[in-house]
Amino acid sequence: MTKINMTFSEEELARMAAEFEQKINEEKERLAKLKDIYTKLFGELSLTDKLAKFIENDSWVKRISNYFKANRELMAELSIIDVTDFGSYMDEFFIKELKDNFTFVDLNFDKLDLPDEDIELWEKSTVFWFTTGLWLVTVEGTDYIVHELSGQGETLYFINTVDDFIVNDPNAKRNLSADDLTKFAEQFKEFALKCKN
């Protein structure tokens, strides 16, 4: 069997290290430019106003979409494919800003104490499929749920109040009866507040 020689000279290693460092610096510059755009789009808003717009969704997405359409050359320069790609960066900057200013309480499913039939109800809702993060954050006395989902190389964030998180979830509304939806919402709120305390 032929062995492949994987040894490199000092010059080759130095060149590869320099190329790697250059790529890291280019990505840092790219992210800094995107962060500047985030500040330009949402910087004049308070965190609570940003939170309201994020939950409302339409006005949040409209700002992002309008900026993308008006700055297509810049988007291409930043290797942004489409509005969704651009929006994912804006969403991540906002979530990071929330985390930097408020305490995120991890909702640990190990604290979930339910009979099997209720666990099946939660699974039937499909709300937590592809979940990679679930937190409770309290802003000005109101409890919110921050839901992170990942799949196919994309990360999405959804936020709603602890009271509305389940009842407004499209998957839960589609997959559960009205009575089951109410039961699920009550159980989830109890679980979330238990994790908080």
Residue ranges and their predicted role:
Residues E12, N25-E27, A32, L47, ...:
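Intrinsically disordered, low-complexity regions enriched in serine, threonine, proline
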Residues M16-A52, N57-R63, N71-L74:
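Contiguous, amphipathic alpha-helical segments that mediate oligomerization or scaffolding
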Residues G153-N197:
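Ampiphathic alpha-helical segments that act as solvent-exposed interaction surfaces
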Residues T2-S9:
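Acidic, low-complexity intrinsically disordered segments
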Residues K62-A172:
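Acidic, low-complexity, intrinsically disordered interaction modules
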Residues S9-E12, M16:
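Surface positions of alpha-helical coiled-coils, especially the charged/polar e/g heptad sites
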